[in-house]
């Protein structure tokens, strides 16, 4: 039997995903917890690849460091 008064309360909780899926569970953190991705919308589980905007990052990198010349030995 666990000691009385030292364990957190284990209450009803709701997990809400960005895709609209809602999961009812129990947790020591009661209330609503919002998550960005879940098993219903994660590419690993759905088999669909989402295209990430990596081109913007590459362009930003090249804009910042693209014209830098390599250092020469002295």
Swiss-Prot record:
Keywords: Metal-binding, Ribonucleoprotein, Ribosomal protein, RNA-binding, rRNA-binding, Zinc. The keyword Metal-binding applies. GO terms for molecular function: metal ion binding; rRNA binding; structural constituent of ribosome. Gene3D superfamilies: Ribosomal protein L31. SUPFAM superfamilies: L28p-like. The keyword Cytoplasm does not apply. Its cofactor is Zn(2+). GO terms for biological process: translation. Binds 1 zinc ion per subunit. GO terms for cellular component: ribonucleoprotein complex; ribosome. InterPro entries: Ribosomal_bL28/bL31-like_sf, Ribosomal_bL31, Ribosomal_bL31_A, Ribosomal_bL31_sf. Zn(2+) binds at residues 17, 19, 38, 41. Part of the 50S ribosomal subunit. Belongs to the bacterial ribosomal protein bL31 family. Type A subfamily. NCBIfam families: L31 (TIGR00105), PRK00019.1 (NF000612). PANTHER family: 50S RIBOSOMAL PROTEIN L31, CHLOROPLASTIC, LARGE RIBOSOMAL SUBUNIT PROTEIN BL31C. Binds the 23S rRNA. This is Large ribosomal subunit protein bL31. It comes from Gloeobacter violaceus (strain ATCC 29082 / PCC 7421).
């Amino acid at each position: 039997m666990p000691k009385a008064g030292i364990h957190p309360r284990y209450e009803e909780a709701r997990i809400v995903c960005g895709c609209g899926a809602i999961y009812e569970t129990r947790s020591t953190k009661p209330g609503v917890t919002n998550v960005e991705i879940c098993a219903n919308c994660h590419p690993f589980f759905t088999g669909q690849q989402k295209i990430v905007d990596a081109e913007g990052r590459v362009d930003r990198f090249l804009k910042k460091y693209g014209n830098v010349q390599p250092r020469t030995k002295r």
